[in-house]
Amino acid sequence: EQTQLSHLRAIIAEKASGRPIELTLKAEDSSEWTFMRPRDYPGVLADLMSELPWDRPLRAAKIHTAEDGTLVLDTFEFGEPLPFTSNHPQYEAKVERTLAYANENLPDWTDSQIRNYFASCSEDYALTITPFRMANHWQLVQELTGTDGTSVAIEAEDDPNLSRIIVAVSNSTRRSMLQRIATSLSKSGINIHRAYLDSVDDGANGWITLVGCVVQGPDGGSIDENSPLWKEVRGDLLRLKWLDQRTVRLGYSFKELTLPCAEIITALSDLINQYLVKKNPYAFNPTRLDTLVRSNITLAISIASLFQDRFNPRNPLQDSEYNARTAELKELIVNTVDLEDARTVFNVMLDAVDAVKRTNLFIEDRYALSMRIDPSLLTTDDRPECPFGVFFVHGRDFNGFHVRFRDISRGGVRAIHPKGIEQF
């Protein structure tokens, strides 16, 4: 109540001054930040989060928007969450209300499971959540407990123009996950009206972050769970935790570029770097490859789309169509790409697509993008021996190769942590 009163006083003071409401309020110990902004728009949450400090863990977030869109009030709390224990004066009342709800609506949710779930909750979360919402969260948590995965759900709201998106993520930094979700929804033209960030303890496995967003679609209405928009958004949300930061930056830099395409582009760039670096380590270093890709993004998207269509399990490209599209792209490279280095990059990228034999691109719960490739792609004068088989794996902050020189499996992993991107 004291916090709400301070917010009201600040709003009244700004209204009286005649100025737009644009304030940032901080607690004396900086444990709580509140942003007030005069206008709501897709991406406002991501913009505000970029102003938050990185040196303190984000405990909770509460995002609110006025019905007419003329005021945004976002509160962020820092520090480690306090557990909700039986010593709290409201503990028994909260548990009893949840037990009563479960008895009527979710009989499989037992007394012991409910009490164990409360024991894993933070105090802020347990005191503010309704039994209905807690039951939904518990079901999502059950899907994830003991894993490092992600669950995504969409629900209808009482207001027919709104939908609720719930994302549960195991062992992800709360701040980075909320920011990635906010940015992803903004890229899709989805406006966040309200949002909540909480987490529950997952025992020895770590913790599970819960992000709930009450949203409005690009057309100003609710989101149809059977629509192509939701299919794309859901796929992006499931993969957000595992995407490399370069993939995210690339995907959000171009309106026409989807995150799956961006992931393919960064993966292929890292793959061909292993071949091109033997030709010229300066002309084909990772930074320059990224620059050349961005300068020819339409061509890069076309190559990524060829990769997608070739391995689409529902309708894979026939060899004749694949060969025709490859020939068209090679002609496009000759006619439209100016720099010789850039032509080399995109021709080798097409060779890489052709060398891929299998991929896990379309597996929904994958942790990284992997490919089985023709080993001859990586043979050079310095590496004349052609292996029996090669697997390439591209993920968040890593690339990996599994190389077999015979048709026999041997154990062993070598992990190298480079000092910087150029050494990488």
Could you describe each region identified by the protein language model?
Residues E1-F392, D397, G411-E422:
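Non-catalytic interaction/regulatory segments
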Residues N399-G400, F405:
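Function-dense linear segments that define catalytic or interfacial modules
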